[in-house]
Amino acid sequence: MPDDRYPVPADRHRVTQEIERSRFITTVAPAATLEEARAFIDEVRAEFPDANHNCWAYVVGPPGSTAAIGMSDDGEPHGTAGRPMLTALLHSGVGDIAAVVTRYFGGIKLGKGGLVRAYTGSVQQALETLPTRERVETATLEIVLEYAASKRGQPADQRVRLQLKQYRL
């Protein structure tokens, strides 16, 4: 799929699953900029302030792009939450996306492998039912012709200014 046309989340989407008495709440949202991704993560954290963990990952840009990515294990053992979540997003075929998995610990330790499977599975479950829309990048060319007032006998000053604007629809 070309970089100028790709699926993005249509809106926020949430799924919940229970694994070994721990509750995993996955929230996915569109994030066309780093600021949008960070604001979304902060909003979910504020919504679940009593959670044991709010792990997150995002991909800003086309599907699979690594130009603007981020992740956090938020207190889980290193590499057991953020990285698996990011990998799921990178392989999803969806761009401009952020995900937060909120975990309420249920009393049973999952181990590193269990955590990787739980966080990967949580994001994949959300992606399976995620409504998407197509993002199309377009270029608009604006041409402005300016004519200066001329005095008798002097040629009019003519300038052409070209301006290329990028829009994401």
Task: Identify the residue ranges that each predicted region occupies.
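Short cationic amphipathic helices and targeting signals
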Residues: 27-29, 140-145, 169
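Short glycine-/aliphatic-rich beta-strand segments at the starts of folded cytosolic domains
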Residues: 133-149
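Generic alpha-helical secondary structure
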Residues: 34-37, 78, 82, 116, ...
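Short amphipathic alpha-helix segments
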Residues: 144-165
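Hydrophobic side chains in well-ordered alpha-helices
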Residues: 37-40, 119, 152-156
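Active-site beta-strand/loop microenvironment that shapes enzyme catalytic pockets
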Residues: 81-129
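C-terminal regulatory domains involved in ligand/effector binding and gene-expression control
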Residues: 1-80
